[in-house]
């Protein structure tokens, strides 16, 4: 039996069965034992359960094994030498050697003075295990090679990674930094620069598929990347890849394009590290979620297996906690923390324990490193604004850019999370401001007003910002068709983020125009239609197709769309229906829901009302209905709500504006019945509300039925909730409905019981705000991308977007700008009380500079140097010159040949053992 491992394969998930009872092929046993680096497997006969056996047995014939057994690992042999060793003729050998090379059991080069072709039996990793996995058809026919590759990057290492010194001891791969990140480093070595290796192998480059991406996907743990062309063979390896149908030649310019696209995606550059400092044969662009090489440092928590000579450091004074470095750091070395000191001084952040002076075993590993490395924030918290925003926009970052006059950069930063900043600058409920630390001193920073100013650029075609498409593919835009049902903020947001990933989604909207509740549920005096249209135009420029006047479930079904080639669906139709009160008389003429009123007026601002109007409800929608009623001609408007004045759901600002316009508000009552005459409402009888919630905290109002008042009226507008109107959309689908007829879905992926159907926005959460829908749309796009890419995990390495607010009660706030909060002016040419035009102006540029200076700069990124692998990806994402690489670990650039690995390991191991003993004595 094979030696037990601390991290066994989950055989239930393998795309094949391990042939444990197979009759052993002796030549394969010998070959596996000869090549493996796994010490236990060298000291005993292989069994059918050993990956060295079943991996080779699946693809290597006995004839191939015969030849390979006459060779030695990594010892080149020319054809004449192989002829002599095997006794076969050259005519017999050449086609066999070619086949062995195409399969991946052999490689070849011309690295000798005569430039004579010589064949090499490579080690498993890096070597034949990768080569086996560079051909899709071969993987399909021999899926065993995928798990073989995975095992050979784990089993030989699980007992030695803690003993590997800086530089990697000639094992596997080695991180090489982003070139731009070390251009100004005077002490850098040539071998630390990608440009050095490209010059060394000038004119000899080939691009091939990534074996990690291919094999992991075949095992059901794909990352959603297109695997083709991310790995670059250099020198003679380029010829080998091309001649054995694993790659194609590329030019220097194409190499640079691949490297740039890799950096755009946050992939890590790595070079082979088994031939010393004078040779590499590949430059890989690695995704940590699938890379078997990066796993050697991340899973075992042994960074020496990967790290370069560089460590990232944050310049705290420049950092604004935008979180871009955090999102892309492959090692989870950067997290958001705080810049402001606590009352007892700066926070001292924990560091990852290292194996240098500690016994190291499975209890020190991070089996779930792909998820742990996506933790965004230290438990002690970070900037409250970023935490409170449902979309977690980099508020502190765009305020700093605005303060510097970098308005376009600020807009670009916002649009990494929010495609509708101009819309949100007018109607957001501003949870960021509610959480703002400045509000504990005087007044919160006017974040939304600053965003509105920044986003004005989007309203002009000449100045609008259209983000670049960044997709994890080098093969052009994705071909998969995706349908989004519903053109509101969730659906449009999903479409936007899919477009940024290289898709061309189609939005189906039943109304004449897109926008959903933004257009049909928010009056123009708060959000003008041209603002909505301007930002939707940007989606169209990105390639989003919007088909209006199409009700899915009626004109066309989901089944029809599937038949038309659509691979995934995002249902985001919102809560477009209004709820009734369930009291006598509510079917009378003159009674309508707020949703209906707002939709009617959204279509026709000349809609007329007259007489006395009562609006039932206390939220922002009720406020909108009241204000719209006055603009439509109502003589008087009274709002009635269950809540006390200080408990009304509507914002204080909205309440104040409504009252200023003439709306009367009566709190603490609910409808008992509607009085009618000749089928028309004439009055509403109200009953006193005595309580809102039951002992479990659920909304369950109680009343005193004897304490009533009667309000005469000619119109009633019900704003007591919204409902989902599914129509025939779900007919024949497996989508399940839960409370309030909302769709039941996975809380992380938003995937329903119908696997290709995802949901988002109000149909999942119930009625919420636009920014909630926007955040949900982005997560929907993440899920759909993972779903439509073959064999991709829906959750592994997924950013869960969890943030924590710093303790505002434990801050030592020093000097700060004492400027008061700025207020935007009102256009005096507009009748702000009765016009449907938006009278609110934006802040002036002078005001924006003054307002952004009020930001206290609460948050900052924090690097754990014990986790940093020195890739430099973080530096490519920072737009504040706040994070740089420093050459703190020059010993990590020591490259040795694989054959000399123990010459490097043994001295380090001895020193480590002494440290461990001293550490024990110290305890």
What do the predicted segments below correspond to?
Residues 331-384, 445-481, 500, 504, ...:
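Flanking helices and flexible, charged tails adjoining ferredoxin-like Fe-S electron-transfer domains
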Residues 587-610, 694-767:
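FAD-site-proximal beta/loop scaffold in flavoenzymes
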Residues 454-475, 534-554, 578-632, 737-753:
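Glycine-rich dinucleotide-binding loop and its adjacent helix/turn
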Residues 88, 119, 270-283, 299-328, ...:
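Ferredoxin-like iron-sulfur electron-transfer modules
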Residues 763-788:
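A conserved FAD-binding loop/helix module that cradles the flavin
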Residues 72, 76, 83-85, 103-112, ...:
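Iron-sulfur cluster-binding cysteine motifs and their immediate structural context
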Residues 115-154:
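Short, amphipathic alpha-helical interaction segments positioned at domain boundaries
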Residues 393-396, 402-403, 444-448, 484-552, ...:
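Beta1-alpha1 glycine-rich phosphate/pyrophosphate-binding loop at the start
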């Amino acid at each position: 039996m094979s030696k037990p491992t601390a991290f066994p394969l989950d055989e239930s998930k393998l795309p094949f069965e391990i042939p444990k009872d197979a009759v052993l092929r002796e030549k394969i046993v010998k070959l596996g034992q000869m090549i493996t680096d796994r010490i236990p497997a060298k000291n005993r006969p292989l069994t059918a359960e050993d990956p060295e056996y079943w991996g080779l047995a699946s693809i290597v014939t006995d004839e191939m094994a015969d030849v390979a057994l006459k060779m030695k690992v990594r010892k080149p042999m020319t054809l004449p030498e192989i002829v002599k060793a095997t006794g076969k003729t050259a005519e017999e050998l050449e086609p066999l050697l070619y086949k062995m090379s195409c399969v991946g059991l052999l490689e070849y080069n011309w690295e000798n003075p005569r430039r004579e072709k010589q064949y090499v039996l490579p080690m498993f990793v890096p070597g034949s295990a990768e080569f086996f996995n560079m051909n899709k058809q071969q993987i399909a026919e021999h899926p065993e090679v995928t798990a073989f590759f995975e095992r050979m990057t784990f089993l030989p290492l699980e007992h030695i990674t803690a003993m590997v010194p800086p530089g990697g001891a000639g094992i596997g791969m080695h991180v090489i930094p982003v070139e731009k990140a070390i251009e100004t480093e005077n002490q850098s070595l040539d071998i630390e620069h990608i440009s050095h290796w490209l010059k060394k192998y000038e004119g000899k480059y080939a691009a091939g598929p990534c074996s990690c991406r291919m094999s992991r996907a075949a095992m059901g743990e794909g990352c959603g990347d297109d695997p083709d062309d991310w790995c670059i063979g250099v020198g003679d390896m380029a010829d080998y890849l091309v001649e054995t149908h694993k790659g194609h030649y590329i030019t220097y310019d194409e190499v640079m394009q691949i490297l740039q696209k890799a950096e755009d995606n946050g992939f890590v550059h790595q070079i082979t590290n088994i031939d010393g400092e004078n040779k590499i044969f590949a430059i890989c662009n690695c995704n940590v979620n699938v890379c078997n090489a990066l796993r050697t440092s991340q899973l075992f928590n042994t960074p020496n297996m990967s790290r370069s000579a560089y460590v990232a450091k944050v310049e705290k004074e420049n950092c604004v906690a935008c979180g871009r470095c955090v999102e892309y750091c492959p090692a989870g070395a950067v997290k958001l923390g705080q810049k402001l000191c606590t009352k007892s001084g700066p926070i001292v952040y924990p560091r990852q324990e290292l194996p240098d002076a500690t016994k190291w075993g499975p209890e020190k590993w991070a089996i779930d490193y792909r998820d742990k490395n996506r933790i965004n924030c230290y438990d002690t918290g970070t900037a409250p604004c970023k935490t409170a925003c449902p979309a977690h926009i980099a508020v502190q970052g765009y305020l700093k850019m605005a303060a510097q006059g970098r308005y376009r950069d600020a807009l670009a930063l916002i649009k990494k999370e929010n495609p509708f900043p101009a819309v949100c600058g007018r109607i957001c409920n501003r949870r960021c401001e509610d959480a703002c630390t400045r509000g504990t001193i005087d007044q919160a920073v006017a974040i939304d007003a600053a965003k509105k100013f920044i986003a004005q650029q989007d309203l002009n075609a000449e100045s609008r910002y259209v983000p670049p498409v960044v997709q994890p593919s080098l093969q052009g835009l994705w071909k998969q068709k995706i349908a989004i049902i519903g053109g509101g903020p969730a659906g449009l947001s999903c479409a936007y983020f899919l477009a940024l990933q290289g898709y061309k989604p189609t939005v189906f909207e039943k109304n004449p125009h897109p926008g959903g509740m933004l257009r049909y549920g928010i009056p123009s005096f708060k959000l003008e239609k041209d603002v909505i249209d301007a930002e939707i135009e940007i989606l169209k420029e990105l390639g989003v197709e919007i088909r209006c006047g199409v009700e899915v479930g009626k004109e066309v079904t989901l089944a029809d769309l599937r038949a038309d080639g659509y691979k995934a669906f995002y249902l985001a139709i919102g809560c477009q229906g209004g709820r009734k009160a369930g009291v006598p008389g509510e079917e009378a003429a003159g009674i309508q829901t707020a949703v209906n009123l707002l939709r009617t007026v959204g279509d026709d601002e000349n809609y007329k009302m007259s007489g006395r109007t009562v609006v039932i409800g206390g939220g922002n929608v009720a406020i909108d209905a009241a204000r719209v009623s006055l603009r439509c001609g109502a003589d008087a408007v009274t709002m009635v709500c269950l809540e006390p004045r200080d408990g009304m759901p509507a914002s204080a600002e909205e309440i104040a504006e409504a009252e200023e316009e003439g709306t009367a508000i009566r709190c603490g009552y609910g409808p008992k019945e509607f009085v009618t005459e000749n089928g028309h409402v004439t009055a509403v009888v109200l009953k006193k509300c005595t309580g809102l919630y039951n002992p479990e905290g659920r909304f369950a109002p109680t009343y005193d039925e004897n304490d009533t008042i009667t309000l005469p009226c000619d119109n009633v507008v019900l704003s007591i909730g919204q409902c989902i109107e599914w129509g025939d959309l779900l007919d024949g689908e497996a989508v399940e409905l839960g409370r309030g007829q909302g769709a039941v879905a996975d809380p992380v992926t938003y995937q329903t019981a119908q696997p290709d159907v995802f949901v988002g926005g109000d149909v999942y959460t119930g009625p919420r705000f636009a920014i909630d829908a926007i955040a949900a749309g982005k997560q929907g796009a993440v899920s759909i991308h993972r779903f439509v890419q073959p064999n991709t995990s829906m959750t592994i390495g997924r950013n869960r977007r969890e943030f924590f607010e710093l303790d505002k009660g434990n801050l030592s706030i020093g000097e700060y700008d004492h400027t008061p909060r700025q207020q935007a002016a009102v256009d005096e040419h507009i009748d702000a009380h009765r016009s449907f035009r938006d009278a609110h102006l934006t802040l002036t540029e002078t005001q924006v500079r003054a307002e952004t200076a009020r930001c206290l700069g609460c948050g900052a990124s924090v690097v754990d140097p014990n986790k940093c692998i020195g890739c430099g990806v973080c530096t490519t994402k920072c737009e504040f010159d706040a994070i740089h690489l420093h050459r703190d670990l020059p010993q990590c650039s020591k490259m040795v040949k694989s054959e000399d690995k123990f010459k490097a390991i043994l001295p380090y191991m001895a020193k480590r053992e002494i440290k461990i003993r001293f550490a024990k004595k110290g305890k």
